């Protein structure tokens, strides 16, 4: 039986409140990029979406490229990630955010519902502050969970474990 690779799309909020999460996501992307059975896409966003997939294996370059600040259009970023999905049942989209949507909440929820109906694995990773305490909009996180996104606030070690479980 042939095993097809997994596509993992890291969708990372780069608004001003997300600095510690950006470092964490850059390191996660580089680790995932080194795995043989994983294709990594790295997408960062504020009100604009920037695809840094070509840098996914180089966390230092990612950190030098991102520009923290600006608003937050999670819906636009998720719609971009949706356009990257080639094999829904072998795709994980991990949204790393504080879930404070500055764009259209309805667009975000509709996109999440569509992806879930295609059996894309959806992980919402809540932002952590410098003391590893969760800092996020729990009401929006709950609405995403209601539409099929698994949402958690985890340290990088626990995120790796969670991702491994989802990809089994």
Model-derived regions: residue spans:
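Acidic, glycine-rich A-domain
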Residues: 1-9, 16-168
